[in-house]
Amino acid sequence: MTTPYFVPNEPLLLALTTAALRGVEVQILVPQRSDSRLVTAAARTYFEELVRVGVRVHQYESSMLHAKTLVVDNLAMVGTANMDNRSFRLNFEVAAVLLDEGIAGSLAATFQADLQHSVEYRLQLGQQNPVWQRLSEATARLLSPLL
């Protein structure tokens, strides 16, 4: 999954968690810094719990990443929806779901290429953050239903 704004609602968080616990390889690619500090702070609060259950979270370092894609086996999704409540409940979004091995393979290859410009989130990375940053991220998480 590639998304510029990752502030998942409970159903998405549960789906990612249960998939990882079942042994499914789940990887998420987000920008290291987005154009919204609040969204970036809120997103970081989800990383630790996802990594603990086996989800691999990658932070894209090169520039602002704005792709919105998902690949599951031979199924690919490309669209305008971010992985956040605003896209799920408020904004008018569109997505194309394509059952095509070639397109899914192409998107998976692009994902792998983007990983070359990314750093994988590790549990100790989040724990090394200063107290003020962890506090601001926790505050942002409280606002996540509105983001």
Predicted regions, residues:
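PLD/PLD-like phosphodiesterase catalytic module centered on the HKD motif
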Residues: 4-147
